[in-house]
From Swiss-Prot:
Modification N6-lipoyllysine occurs at: K63
Keywords (A to Z) from UniProt: Lipoyl
Known function: The glycine cleavage system catalyzes the degradation of glycine. The H protein shuttles the methylamine group of glycine from the P protein to the T protein.
Family classification: Belongs to the GcvH family.
Name used for this protein in its record: Glycine cleavage system H protein
Any single GO CC term annotated in Swiss-Prot or TrEMBL for this entry: cytosol
Cofactor binding comment, as recorded: Binds 1 lipoyl cofactor covalently.
Single GO biological process annotation from the record: glycine decarboxylation via glycine cleavage system
Domain Lipoyl-binding: residue ranges: 22-104
Organism: Listeria monocytogenes serovar 1/2a (strain ATCC BAA-679 / EGD-e)
């Protein structure tokens, strides 16, 4: 299982990457593996303000439907529209082309509360 060291993580298996003033968010390799083949992704709307811990969309796989939670509070400035036609990108490349959304105006305290890759690895053990 792949676990990039330059990302931050949540115990709910989301990842967060700082990207020049904004934050890109997706689900981890562990999460996509647990879900199985992803067939549909419900995304939030650009312009929405999301609150840490709130459900902001869902991911449907052949096994189940799971809510996707905001790992930090912020404003949605982009969603990965490619996932509408190719949701399986989350399975094949969860940390790159399978990203889900991008936030700005993020609460710094929320970012500081995220887990390092080493701490997230302990959650998985």
């Amino acid at each position: 299982m792949s676990l990039p060291k330059d990302l931050l993580y949540t115990e709910e298996h989301e990842w967060v990457k700082a990207d020049d003033g904004s934050y890109v968010i997706g689900i981890t390799d562990f999460a996509q593996d647990q879900l199985g083949d992803i067939v549909f992704v419900e995304l939030p709307e650009v312009g929405d303000t999301v609150t840490k811990g709130d459900s902001i969309g869902s991911i449907e796989s052949v096994k189940t439907v799971s809510d996707f939670y905001a790992p930090v509070t912020g404003k949605v400035v982009a969603v990965n529209e490619t996932l509408e036609d190719e949701p399986e990108l989350i399975n094949s490349n969860p940390y790159d082309t399978g990203w889900i959304l991008k936030l700005e105006e993020v609460e710094e305290a929320d970012v500081k509360a995220l887990l390092s890759s080493d701490d997230y690895e302990k959650v998985l053990d």
